[in-house]
UniProtKB/Swiss-Prot annotation:
The name this protein goes by in its record: Beta-amyrin 28-monooxygenase CYP716A378
Tissue specificity field: Mainly expressed in flowers and flower buds, to a lesser extent in young leaves and, at low levels, in old leaves, stems and roots.
Top EC category: oxidoreductase
Organism the protein comes from: Saponaria officinalis (Common soapwort)
Localisation per UniProt entry: Membrane
SUPFAM superfamilies according to UniProt: Cytochrome P450
EC number: 1.14.14.126
Gene Ontology MF, one: beta-amyrin 28-monooxygenase activity
Gene (name only): CYP716A378
Membrane topology label: Single-pass type II membrane protein
Positions annotated to bind heme: C426
Pfam family, one: p450
């Protein structure tokens, strides 16, 4: 963390002491029986500790240390990203939040989102999300997803040939990001040229970090870098949008070929079409959601398969049975995906131990009582995946890697939440499943590997990532399966 950044936080905190005093008196006067907890420093609250625990590799510490302190309560108060927050933990809390979407709570994003996605200031980030959810079902329905599988397989093959084959050592995380970003560009924008894809792929790391950061727009801060990166990507997207408009008018592009064409040609309920900034921001959000979480999952699949040879052997056996059933040049299809039951159990266990989505915020629409505590209107609520994923009451021996947890009906409801839950469950969950399984198929049938840094630190910012990118030594199989067309 840059020295001037820390100094800036301290200075801002000092200037906010009077505001904190007035706020404390106002809250006390209202007489709420609030959850136990503390609000931390003025303005920044406990944001630094909340974020720094992730940077240091143990994001669950912020949650579990407070749960232990306020036991048996499963809810505590804090202040994060400039907001008063009730952190709600456990399956019962998850059920309450997911079941009361649109009734007692609504989705909420930090104010930093409005800076990075400026079109959302015209309405609100919540309204923008609603619009997106109306646009997405066509592209994530089963028949559409089935059509994507051969395309995903083709891109995975090309990615392996370009980035993995012929190399003895690689860093997994950057390559996983290239794979998932290439897929998102191909399926959302019909961009298939790796050079074009690479042109605006790099800034996405800064965008994701900026979204969940302390919203201080000073040079060098994560928030400032996120804003700058989003502007770079947005300009590139506007160029793509202008060209697509020309291609559609000249019949060089299809109205149904991808999400971009759909956005350009579909009016809202009032007959109005989205402008270029609206479309650029929505595509930007899709590209972030469409590749960031899946790339983290793919990376940790590689990590755990390197650490657990018996798990690797089970995945290898399943994937080789599928590979050997294919004709030369034949791509994966829906039936093949349905056979990858053990592989998906492994991926699910990976996402239990390293959830790509660490948690999410809601906003209280009105005052309500929960577990004997008053939650005031306007307060933010935060649910944490780790509060159940690493809870022995939900998953016995939670640190043990056990894909069998997902056999049969799987974990109890509201305990396994890597994609959220309720009406706000990630609409791209099935899309993510496909890109993860296609990745597993293509890497396992080509290689075994070993980690080059046995105890590499895992950082969370905002998703879990290996601090050094997960360098591995590749060991190609002696008799690789033919994959060329």
């Amino acid at each position: 963390m840059e020295l001037f950044f820390i100094c800036g936080l301290v200075l801002f905190s000092t200037l906010s002491l009077i505001s904190l005093f007035l706020l404390h008196n106002h809250s006390s006067a209202r007489g709420y029986r609030l959850p136990p907890g503390r609000m931390g420093w003025p303005f920044i609250g406990e944001s630094y500790e909340f974020l720094a625990n992730g940077w240091k590799g143990y994001p669950e510490k912020f949650i579990f240390s407070r749960l232990a302190k306020y036991k048996p309560n499963q809810v505590f108060k804090t202040s994060i990203l400039g907001e008063k927050v009730a952190v709600m933990c456990g399956a019962t809390c998850n059920k309450f939040l997911f079941s009361n979407e649109g009734k007692l709570v609504n989705a909420w994003w930090p104010n930093s989102v409005n800076k990075i996605f400026p079109s959302s200031t015209q309405t609100s980030s919540k309204e923008e999300a609603k619009k997106m959810r109306k646009l997405l079902p066509t592209f994530f329905k089963p028949e559409a997803l089935q059509r994507y599988i051969p395309i995903m397989d083709e891109i995975a093959i090309r990615h392996m040939e370009d980035e993995w084959e012929g190399k003895s050592k690689i860093e997994v995380f950057p390559l996983a990001k290239r794979y998932t970003f290439w897929l998102a560009c191909r399926l959302f924008l019909s961009i298939d040229d790796p050079v074009h894809v690479a042109k605006f792929a790099d800034p996405f790391n800064d965008i994701a970090s900026g979204i969940i950061s302390i919203p201080i727009d000073l040079p060098g801060t994560p928030f400032n870098r996120g804003i700058k990166a989003s502007n770079v990507v947005r300009q590139e997207l506007k160029t793509i949008i202008k060209q697509r408009k020309l291609d559609l008018s000249d019949n060089k592009a299809s109205p149904t070929q991808d999400i971009l064409s759909h956005m350009l040609l579909t009016p809202d309920e009032d007959g109005r079409y989205m402008n270029e900034l609206d479309i650029a921001d929505k595509i930007l959000g899709l590209l972030i959601g469409g590749h960031d979480t899946a790339s983290a999952a793919c990376t940790f699949v590689v990590k755990f398969l390197a650490e657990l040879p018996h798990i690797y052997d089970g995945v290898y056996k399943e994937q080789m049975e599928i590979a050997k059933s294919k004709k030369e040049g034949e791509r994966l299809n829906w039936e093949d995906i349905q056979k990858m039951k053990y592989s998906w159990n492994v991926a699910c266990e990976v996402m239990r131990l390293a959830p790509p989505l660490q948690g999410a915020f809601r906003e209280a629409l009105s005052d309500f009582m929960y577990a004997g505590f008053q939650i005031p209107k306007g307060w933010k609520l935060y649910w944490s995946a780790n509060s159940t994923h690493r809870n022995p009451e939900c998953f016995p021996e939670p640190e043990k890697f056990d894909p069998a947890r997902f056999d049969g009906s799987g974990p109890a409801p509201y305990t396994y939440v890597p994609f959220g839950g309720g009406p706000r469950m990630c609409p791209g969950k099935e899309y993510a499943r496909l890109e993860i399984l296609v990745f597993m198929h293509n890497i396992v049938k080509r290689f075994k590997w070993e980690k080059l840094i046995p105890d590499e630190t895992i950082v969370v910012n905002p998703m879990p990532t290996p601090a050094k990118g997960l360098p591995v030594r590749l060991r190609p199989h002696s008799k690789p399966v033919t994959v060329s067309a």
